[in-house]
UniProtKB/Swiss-Prot annotation:
Localization, UniProt: Cell membrane
Disulfide bonds: none
Protein name in the entry: Alpha-glucosides permease MPH3
Comp. bias regions, Basic and acidic residues: 582-595
Length: 602
């Protein structure tokens, strides 16, 4: 916090000086300034400045130049302070920001819950008999593979639509109101699921509920990354993964209860659907009182509201707090202005592919999130069904699922500790490497039909869940918030999540064919397939995924602009606020009567 203390003191001195000499000019300052382009003046893009020595009163333009350099210097100091801020200091300074971020991310509990109960329903006896068909060979009731695929496609298609609607909605009304609208529709669409009497009604309900889920997927990550400092970014973005796991654990517990008490009652599947009404109302009320993202407000030119929003995320009071707010707004403005100079247009989906820099950032973000599906994690979502098809009893299958989600929660907490010693890329790559090994072992056990091998394959799937939630699962939520530029963050995250959804659809279809007894009936041998796909994902990460740990958004922007290779991101040092030949005090006997000054665009 040394930089921050120095900056606060400097700001106080500057304020004091302005009070001592109100309306007066220093004798060495030039009389007036003529600029080439008035629009560039506001964007820190000063390419030519001329000083005339014939008078001594400073003009308004001269004040603008001073303000520009002060703002750039303040932004640099604020950026350095954020990068060097310890975790304890960040929590003490931004406790409200952390609390608001946790509240918004809690919306993901509902998506994790519902997607988990859908997979568990396929192993629930009452659900199988009411909506399934009987296998002529075994006499067992089962939901057909085509319907399992159809239901999965429905909610994922709904998420894709919801994600695409999220972009224009955020542009229009902001993050908070978009989330509140999504929560309202989720509560309304749940009625369709509760009163379902056919798989067709469930399909419609899943598709409609998928739209607000898509909104939650995008905004929880972007909101957490924009409202919190660098020291808290990893913890609060990866909390999204914890919310998924809490939802899945909640679902596993409810489904185990349904399997025990309501195995032959419609409450076995109606009660899990009804419990989705618990969270929308309290979450909507909490989000209504939450501050809007200051980055969104600055992009809209609403600077006073951005300052009010930042005040609500900071602790303390007095002039120090106001200085921190001003510094943060300056940093956000400088960052956004630098990005805007790359294009004069408002950020759109086409801008994500407009030039080489943005194409690279979009590609990495999309493939990074798609890696959550290609690493075999979709199999974890069908764990209860997998255990049953691997030969484990129905009751033990539900017990295994609960243990699996508990291990996932522990692994995510462990990743918070590991993030102090390992980077984002390290956790992503190590997790993939361990999963690859375990999947091949599961496939090998699937070649045996003994009771021990069946229990072993089920136990190892829990190991996959542990390594997944230690590495790739939590770190992806942080990476996808850091890779895009601030101007295109929401839209890039939407594209990335939709890429994940499309890949997940393909992976889900493959898994259902692999596990269904009427189709390929691979059982645990499917581990071979996912081991190969997981290894391919690891190769991509080694080649293309940069290390962003310890880098602020402005530094990441500069590294991408310079075209630094993925494996050199960590070691490359940049100064995003470099100023070339800044204007100095001008003597009145300047022989030419003019001085040129240049400021680096980026």
């Amino acid at each position: 916090m040394k930089n921050l203390s120095f900056l606060i003191n400097r700001r106080k001195e500057n304020t004091s000086d302005s009070n001592v000499y109100p309306g007066k000019a220093k004798s060495h300052e030039p009389s007036w300034i003529e600029m080439d382009d008035q629009t560039k003046k506001d964007g820190l893009d000063i390419v030519h400045v001329e000083f005339s020595p014939d008078t001594r009163a400073p003009s308004d333009s001269n004040k603008v130049i001073t303000e520009i350099f002060d703002a750039t210097e303040d932004a640099k100091e604020a950026d350095e302070s954020e990068r060097g801020m310890p975790l304890a200091t960040a929590l003490n300074t931004y406790p409200k920001a952390a609390a608001w971020s946790l509240l918004v991310s809690t919306t993901l509990i509902m998506e994790g819950y519902d997607t988990a109960i859908l997979g568990a329903f396929y192993a629930l006896p009452i659900f199988q008999r009411k909506f399934g068909s009987q296998n002529d060979k075994t006499g067992e009731w089962e939901i057909s593979a085509s319907w399992q695929i159809g239901l999965t496609l429905c909610y994922m298609a709904g998420e894709i639509v919801g994600l695409q609607l999220t972009g224009p909605s955020v542009d229009l009304v902001g993050n908070r109101y978009t989330l509140i609208i999504a929560l309202f529709f989720l509560a309304a669409f749940t009625f369709i699921l509760y009163f379902c009497n056919s798989l067709g009604m469930i399909a419609v309900g899943q598709a409609l509920c998928g739209m607000p889920w898509g909104c939650f997927q995008c905004l929880t990550v972007s909101y957490a990354s924009e409202i919190c400092p660098l020291a808290l970014r990893y913890y609060l973005t990866t909390y999204s993964n914890l919310c998924w796991l809490f939802g899945q654990l909640f679902a596993a517990g409810i489904m185990k209860n349904s399997q025990k008490k309501y195995a032959d009652s419609e409450l076995g599947y109606k009660l899990p659907f009804a419990l989705q009404w618990i969270l929308p109302v309290p979450l909507a009320l909490g989000i209504f009182f939450a501050p809007e993202s200051p980055w969104w407000l600055v992009k809209k030119g609403r600077f006073d509201e951005a300052r009010r929003s930042l005040r609500r995320t900071l602790s303390g009071k007095g002039p120090e707090k106001e200085i921190l707010v001003t510094l943060e707004v300056d940093k956000i403005k400088v960052t956004i202005d630098k990005e805007k100079r790359l294009t004069s247009k408002e950020g759109s989906y086409s801008d994500c592919f407009e030039d080489k820099i943005n194409r690279r950032r979009t590609r990495i973000t999309c493939l990074c999130w798609a890696g959550q599906a290609t690493c075999g994690s979709i199999l974890i979502g069908y764990s209860t069904y997998f255990y049953e098809k691997a030969g484990v009893s129905t009751e033990m299958s539900f017990t295994f699922s609960i243990i699996q989600y508990c291990l996932g929660i522990c692994a995510t907490f462990l990743s918070w500790w590991a993030s102090k010693y390992f980077g984002r890329y390290d956790l992503y790559a190590f997790g993939l490497a361990f999963q690859t090994i375990v999947f091949f072992i599961i496939g090998g056990l699937g070649c045996s039909s003994t009771h021990g091998s069946k229990m072993g394959s089920g136990s190892l799937l829990m190991a996959v869940a542990f390594f997944y939630n230690l590495g790739i699962a939590p770190v992806v939520f942080c990476l996808v918030s850091e890779m895009p530029s601030s101007r295109l963050r929401t839209k890039t995250i939407i594209l990335a999540r939709n890429t994940y959804n499309v890949v997940s659809i393909i992976c889900s279809v493959l898994i259902l064919y692999q596990l269904n007894s009427k189709k390929w009936n691979w059982g645990a041998k499917s581990g071979f397939f996912w081991g190969v796909l997981c290894f391919c994902t690891l190769i991509w990460a080694v080649v293309d995924l940069p290390e962003t740990a310890g880098k602020t958004f402005v530094e990441i922007n500069e590294l991408f602009k310079l075209g630094v290779s993925a494996r050199k991101f960590k070691s490359t040092k940049v100064d995003p606020f470099v100023v070339k030949n800044p204007p100095k005090d001008v003597s009145h006997n300047d022989p030419k009567g003019d001085i040129e000054a240049s400021i680096a665009e980026e």
